[in-house]
Amino acid sequence: MWERERSPIRNDEQHLAGEPSLKAVRFVSRQEKPFKVNMLREAGSYFLRTLTLQYQPVYIAALGATAFQLGVANSIGGLSAVAIALPIGWLADKYGVRRIFLAATGAMLFGAFLFASAESWTIVILALLIGNLGLQMETTACPIVCGSCLKDKERATGMGLCDTLTAIPGLVSPLIGAVLITRFGGLNVNGIRPLYYLQVIGFSMILIFILVEFTEPKRRGLKIQSGFNESIRELFDRGTKLKSWILFVSLSTIPLYMATMVYVPFFAAEIKQANAFVLGGMAMASMVMPLTLSIPLGRLADRIGRKKVLYLTTSIYCLSLLLLVYAVDSTMLLLSGVLQGFSVLASVTRGAMTAELVPTALLGRMFGTLGLFRGLVMILSPVGGGVLWTAIGPESVFYVIIALQVLSMFLLVTMPETSSSRHVTTRT
């Protein structure tokens, strides 16, 4: 069972309130080794992913894809995430997250190699399939480490701190990408391709790092004995309002796969005529809010509840999309990028809340189940965005996203607050 020692937890929060750099170091240093090693692993992985994130839609289009084909490619690429989501959660519970991290990094390495060697947009589909497979495995395993190593009352704070520290490389990677793209020829295939070769080298180094340094979290030592189907039934028997939560998370994930990964950078480049440095600046700007507010918002979520923080962060993210649509210059695009960072803050809070809706031993299955539905969103969202872009107009993509986020907030009203309770075992 999770410890509930109130006084030490209050002290942890006070430690993070003053002299934040020193206190953050103390907070991290007293955590278990798997938590600290995972932070370094995620920081490296995040750097490599954000190196190409803003430029990937432009790269695929430069290989010959139209706006609709861009959506189709990303949608097909999401099939692997759907196929692997539930088994990965179950395997993480049964065999541990270390093996999942190794497989995930290997898949992302191979996906990066396929991107680097692609000569047409159709080849990119295979790269997306394999890369998304690795990303799905990583996304499922990573929060299990935090859920296993952090105490209940400090979870949102700890996850916010983890998000802050691992996001720091994301401040420099888009700028590095912009410099390299400019050096190698601009926003075209030859200019963007070298970034994927850098990913190949980087993921190779992370793979070695996991092999040498990562050990299984102690609290994950429990092995499940039931079969796959029985274990999923157990999840819904012992979880709290999981059906409503899964629907909420699915709606909340649409911006990532329709906007952030596909149509925000494509819209900025094609409609607003943003160059490589503006695209990179938007990506860098999106990390400003996570870096400055992750810890304060984590503490706030621990104190006043996760739901209120989610209402706030989701609303500001919707405002960022309106700024993007109505931007008349690069300054407005950069401001939109700053506010888009609130989607990252919302995802951290959702992760903390997810970990409190099920018993600790079921975390792998919980995040695996969410991964299944995220995968479905990954399939449907890009092609849906492509249809909207082609049939109605580019701006309609973002109006629909805003409407769906408003709907998600109404759904959140039906969920119980989790920050002061743990593990209701009634089926809902």
Residue ranges with predicted function:
Residues 193-211, 397-413:
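Symmetry-related core transmembrane helices of the 12-TM Major Facilitator Superfamily/SLC fold
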Residues 160-178, 371-381:
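Glycine-rich segments within core transmembrane alpha-helices of 12-TM secondary carriers
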Residues 21-83, 241-283:
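Helix-loop boundary and gating motifs at the non-cytosolic
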Residues 137-150, 345-358:
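Intracellular juxtamembrane helix-capping segments at the cytosolic ends
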Residues 99-114, 308-323, 402:
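Structural signature of the two symmetry-related core transmembrane helices
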Residues 2-5, 10-35, 215-247, 428:
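Juxtamembrane intracellular "pre-TM" segments in multi-pass secondary transporters
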Residues 84-96, 181, 292-305, 389:
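Helix-to-loop junctions at the C-terminal end of transmembrane segments
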Residues 209-224, 413-425:
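Helix-loop junctions on the cytosolic side of multi-pass membrane transporters
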